[in-house]
Amino acid sequence: MSNKYDYDLIAIGAGSGGLSVAERAAAYGAKCAVVENGKMGGTCVNVGCVPKKIMWYGANLAHALEDAKDYGFDLENKGFDWNHLVTKREKYISGINNWYHNYLADSNIDELTGFASMVDEHTIDVDGKQFTARHIVVSPGTKPTIPDIKGAEHGISSDGFFALTACPKKVAIVGSGYIAVEVAGVLQA
């Protein structure tokens, strides 16, 4: 690394993209940092793949318990405790977030906490403090889009689904992709 810069590489965003590019560069000896203003792991870990699969697995168990009597099991199904599943899900995700903090430290990747903005092609500002790098990778992730349709203000996004404190009695899901189908299965449990 040249003494001209604080880092060889700074990745803005600690999701799959930012973490993997910093990890690879650090493995080759580059001095790296990752900037994140939220939870480590990005969308997949926090409001995507991981929490959805945990909820999906819980729903599958609920369906299996219901079907068990058809296979000779005499089980009493006392229902599905939404709050218990959400608590377990959040504990699991928190463990992944904490693992990333330790992993970055073990990989000699600095963790810069805050909101990053570009100053110039080699400089970022993180909540009032400036850092320089030979390479800056912008990998900020995304948020779900709420469609511009009448009544959209009454709906929630997939992020909102993971913020639910109770399972709603009635739901209409807009969309038919695999995420929509899996969320429908969870809510039906």
Stretches with model-predicted labels:
Residues 165-189:
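Rossmann-like NAD(P)H-binding beta-loop-alpha module
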Residues 7-34, 180-189:
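N-terminal Rossmann-like FAD-binding beta1-loop-alpha1 element of flavoenzymes
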Residues 15, 115-117, 177:
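Conserved acidic residues
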